[in-house]
Amino acid sequence: MSPKTETKASVGFKAGVKDYRLTYYTPEYQTKDTDILAAFRVTPQPGVPPEEAGAAVAAESSTGTWTTVWTDGLTSLDRYKGRCYDIEPVPGEENQYIVYVAYPLDLFEEGSVTNLFTSIVGNVFGFKALRALRLEDLRIPPAYSKTFQGPPHGIQVERDKLNKYGRPLLGCTIKPKLGLSAKNYGRAVYECLRGGLDFTKDDENVNSQPFMRWRDRFCFCAEALFKAQAETGEIKGHYLNATAGTCEEMMKRAVFARELGVPIVMHDYLTGGFTANTSLAHYCRDNGLLLHIHRAMHAVIDRQKNHGMHFRVLAKALRMSGGDHIHAGTVVGKLEGEREVTLGFVDLLRDDFIEKDRSRGIYFTQDWVSMPGVIPVASGGIHVWHMPALTEIFGDDSVLQFGGGTLGHPWGNAPGAVANRVALEACVEARNEGRDLAREGNEVIREASKWSPELAAACEVWKEIIFEFETIDTL
């Protein structure tokens, strides 16, 4: 041991346990442009002061452990430690606080969501001194976001590939989600695309099961979309789910999709994992494939208000890891999603620069610089009567995806697709004429149904179907 090292390691070291706040609570700290900033919702155990709880989060998600260690003297804690720099009580909640933590950029591997999350949402979430812990938001500095490729292509490139502008895109998840043979599955794909949809989709749990192996499904779906393209003169796509049990198998499926000449593949990014997702996103950019992302398992992580991680963080992570579409709730359908909160993370997916706005749950200003945007997908319990609201809420840069709302049409799959396309075109035309879809939406649909029997039949079937439940994901 050199004299210099010996002195650094031994001078000032005192074994034992001391409060986290003595080292990691630094309210005087001025955050840097290069810091990664986190907003945690912290519920301390009884008797634990908020300063100690906040400092514990900063410590256990960065350089700290439960006791002092002599190896602290071999490095510069001031350079590498996370810092709890602000604490504010949550209005209306007893013993709950928003804790702000700043992390030095050098704590994280470049271009790795996996490494970022392993630290910030790792073991600290099981820390006994906390009753509950939720990550509400992250500020990703450009110095870090620029180390990621991001989405394979982005919104503008996708529109150019599809030659479709000025309206939301239409999709449909093939149902029943499990049990169809590959040929019957392909038939449903063809009928929906021929009827006017832009995309059809594998359900998230369709991988390669005994009733339908992946290669058979890929072949029949490719045949269906090329036939529909020839008949309609429009570019069509089917989200071929490449998710698999190993990264090697996932990549093999993506390669086969490219060889078939289809425009888009799909991945379940949370169950598949960020490492696999980032690898697939890089392949998709290099080989001209669009990448649709499903968020299966997200509600396990994000639905509880006081513990876990808000979906806006998962959305930011996906934009960095890579995806051209991601499911983002509907506001009006069967799945969870409060309007202002949903639109907050929709903006975080699509826009280049998003201002801090606590009324929408956005804790930090986020500058994505030149990273491409992600198209939000509205899917889950929606039908033709929802079309005006969806068009008004999500705007043109979105995918509106009707599964049961297409395949449940009383006349069949193709008429279901026709009904949705007519409803969408009517809403876009009405909006472009200056009509208020929020107030006049039902009238727009009724007018369009007079000259579309397919839409009229859909309107009759679903005229009383609503999903009225109290939203859990509120501010």
Swiss-Prot record:
Lineage: Eukaryota, Viridiplantae, Streptophyta, Embryophyta, Tracheophyta
EC number: 4.1.1.39
Catalytic residues identified in the record: K175 (proton acceptor), H294 (proton acceptor)
Pfam families per the UniProt record, alphabetical: RuBisCO_large, RuBisCO_large_N
Organism for this UniProt entry: Afrocarpus gracilior (African fern pine)
Extra remark: The basic functional RuBisCO is composed of a large chain homodimer in a 'head-to-tail' conformation. In form I RuBisCO this homodimer is arranged in a barrel-like tetramer with the small subunits forming a tetrameric 'cap' on each end of the 'barrel'.
Modification N6,N6,N6-trimethyllysine, positions: K14
Enzyme class: lyase
HAMAP family given in the database record: RuBisCO_L_type1
Subcellular location: Plastid, Chloroplast
Quaternary structure annotation from Swiss-Prot or TrEMBL: Heterohexadecamer of 8 large chains and 8 small chains; disulfide-linked. The disulfide link is formed within the large subunit homodimers.
Family the UniProt entry places it in: Belongs to the RuBisCO large chain family. Type I subfamily.
Post-translational modification note: The disulfide bond which can form in the large chain dimeric partners within the hexadecamer appears to be associated with oxidative stress and protein turnover.
Annotated residues for binding of substrate: N123, T173, K177, R295, H327, S379
Xref: PROSITE patterns: RUBISCO_LARGE
Catalytic activity: 2 (2R)-3-phosphoglycerate + 2 H(+) = D-ribulose 1,5-bisphosphate + CO2 + H2O; D-ribulose 1,5-bisphosphate + O2 = 2-phosphoglycolate + (2R)-3-phosphoglycerate + 2 H(+)
Protein name per its UniProtKB record: Ribulose bisphosphate carboxylase large chain
Marked site: Transition state stabilizer: K334
Propeptide: 1-2
Modified residues (N6-carboxylysine): K201
Modified residues (N-acetylproline): P3
